[in-house]
Amino acid sequence: MMEDDGQPRTLYVGNLSRDVTEVLILQLFSQIGPCKSCKMITEHTSNDPYCFVEFYEHRDAAAALAAMNGRKILGKEVKVNWATTPSSQKKDTSNHFHVFVGDLSPEITTEDIKSAFAPFGKISDARVVKDMATGKSKGYGFVSFYNKLDAENAIVHMGGQWLGGRQIRTNWATRKPPAPKSTQENNTKQLRFEDVVNQSSPKNCTVYCGGIASGLTDQLMRQTFSPFGQIMEIRVFPEKGYSFVRFSTHESAAHAIVSVNGTTIEGHVVKCYWGKESPDMTKNFQQVDYSQWGQWSQVYGNPQQYGQYMANGWQVPPYGVYGQPWNQQGFGVDQSPSAAWMGGFGAQPPQGQAPPPVIPPPNQAGYGMASYQTQ
């Protein structure tokens, strides 16, 4: 359960013997740190009793969690974990100012990012997003401030700073507005990182982004894709409404495809997928085999859901490596006033249709990214 400063201090202690009492629990846990209370829950069923132990200090609760989980009390191995707060009691941070923090090292914790951003003002919430199955960090998180100016300063001064061996990326995280009913019904398909990263060669670092009929610029693409990794090259074709973005790593490109596909940029729902690259990257534009779309539609045809930032109906953008079940409204990264990060998914080519062909101009010979052919 969360206190006013956001630090949990209450532990759940389960799988208890029916002979265990509140007094005994307090005696044992007080050896680690001063306890405020203990509440024993004994249900009139076959289930074992459990209790909640509240400490005065978060550090004592954390120490007790590490020390007591798996220990035997009166012959039974107890289970200790952080007590969860019912969603109805969660702090409402919907009107606070949320900062997206990307490119986090795997070892970075919620406490680490909270400490790093604390100098900029009072923080209402902070979270490193984790894979719900493995417990590993997905490489990004969020920090919420009470004050907008504090959040702005944090974005400006923390972007590019080193944290745990990596330069982090910061930007606004904005709440995704409800989609129209028709959009919700027709565009529910979501991409998973595990599927996308394996759809192309590990040497392929190029993303195709299409569907931007107006306002397409190099700067817009850089703002849109920079949170996902180092960009090596950008080629835009404004008259065609699409662009190619080449990253330094295959994984960064996969993150970008998963996160940007189906989002709204300059008022247009965009489509992102791999640009096909040949083993010899010095050759001219290579053609993308659009028969892959049949495979993609099968792979991505089942609705997927993602691990969420569990605070008042907010959700993280699927920026991380592992997608996990959840089903709420979405966080997105606001890239610019005119290109809001919408975090949505689902735009797919109509059946039997291929995206428009890319015809490289003569002065672009040797450009080793990707082009597309019709079937």
UniProtKB/Swiss-Prot annotation:
Modified-residue entries (N6-acetyllysine), positions: 122
Biased composition (Pro residues): 352-363
Annotated keywords: Acetylation, Apoptosis, Cytoplasm, Lysosome, Nucleus, Phosphoprotein, Repeat, RNA-binding
Domain called RRM: residue spans: 9-85, 97-175, 205-277
GO cellular component, one term: cytoplasm
Cited InterPro entries: Nucleotide-bd_a/b_plait_sf, RBD_domain_sf, RRM_dom, RRM_dom_euk, TIAR_RRM1, TIAR_RRM2, TIAR_RRM3
Tissues expressed in: Expressed in brain, heart, kidney, lung and skeletal muscle.
Location of the region described as Disordered in the Swiss-Prot/TrEMBL record: 345-375
Domain of life, per lineage: Eukaryota
A single MF term (Gene Ontology): protein-RNA adaptor activity
Domain comment, as recorded: The RRM 2 domain is required for the binding to target RNA, and the RRM 1 and RRM 3 domains seem to contribute to the affinity of the interaction with RNA. The RRM2 domain and the C-terminal residues 290-339 contribute to nuclear localization.
Protein name: Nucleolysin TIAR
Source organism: Homo sapiens (Human)
Name of encoding gene: TIAL1
